[in-house]
From Swiss-Prot:
Keywords: Methyltransferase, S-adenosyl-L-methionine, Transferase. It comes from Yarrowia lipolytica (strain CLIB 122 / E 150) (Yeast). PANTHER family: LEUCINE CARBOXYL METHYLTRANSFERASE, LEUCINE CARBOXYL METHYLTRANSFERASE 1. S-adenosyl-L-methionine binds at residues 74, 101, 128, 172-173, 196. GO terms for molecular function: protein C-terminal leucine carboxyl O-methyltransferase activity. Methylates the carboxyl group of the C-terminal leucine residue of protein phosphatase 2A catalytic subunits to form alpha-leucine ester residues. One of its GO terms (biological process) is methylation. Gene3D superfamilies: Vaccinia Virus protein VP39 (3.40.50.150). This is Leucine carboxyl methyltransferase 1. It holds the Pfam family LCM. It catalyses: [phosphatase 2A protein]-C-terminal L-leucine + S-adenosyl-L-methionine = [phosphatase 2A protein]-C-terminal L-leucine methyl ester + S-adenosyl-L-homocysteine. Belongs to the methyltransferase superfamily. LCMT family.
Amino acid sequence: MNLRKDKVVQSTDGDALSSKYSAVQKGYLQDEFIDLFVAGSKQAAAQQGPGSARKVVAQFQPKLPLINRGTFVRHHAIDVLVDRFLAAKKPGQRVQIISLGAGSDTRPFSLWSSKPENRDEILYHEIDFAVSVERKRDIIMQDSTLRELVGAQEYDKTTGMHTQRYHLHGIDLRSIGPGFVLPGSDPSLATLIISECCLCYLEPDQAKQVIFWITSEFTNSTIVMYEPLSGQDQFGQVMIENLASRGISIPSMTKFPSLESQIERFKAAGYTEVLATSMDVIHDEWLSPEEQQRIHGLEFLDEREELLLLLKHYCVVWASNLTK
């Protein structure tokens, strides 16, 4: 176990949070809960000293239009696929969502807030490193709205949080193997697994083991995965080198460099329905003309070709064994 590498991976949650915060501030996205997590991130940094506090303040400065647009497309794609999963359930049916490497994601709170019936119908699990989970638990417990949404009754000082509708797990995904039982999970429920730039940080054999656990434990399941592609081209190689300069290694970019290799990856794992597309296609084809017009009006973007090249090197995969 490489503690330095773990800390680098944990720090990427701050990157994702600050990017989403910038997109929210510019009007690309709506998130009524993000300010709580930004404040929590700044508070945690302040406790580590002036250097960390200054770094976090700089991190939450507005992003370039290119980054804001890419962040919007990422969240739009995941939103569409989560909505697709939920739309397939029958009225009153209970389903389960398991988010790998959830970090500061606010999705469960938004789902429960937007539709009160979701509180009884969506069992939500979030998995991340213990240090990330403890910070998220503290943010939840310090806010009455979040406490009510998750159904928390009292402040439990143990790692994580467990209620009737929400489970926050401090688990290292590398420890998951055959026979592992996720506390509070219900394998009988239709289950959606979300991996937003999570499995990509694991070594291929470790990620394969997690996917095998999912397919064996949750036989009625769908995986929605978002991660980068190298494309086996110069741009992808530059991405890999830039990440390496920050101490970030993404093994999946080499092991699964293309859409075709990602599709084959999940077919080999036993999934019967596997679809994959790059984010440039989502940008051009998944947005309505009205939404395209709206986001074009938010900021001037003179790097359309650069944006599409960047988006081409990220993908979303839908792999399903859901019972019809």
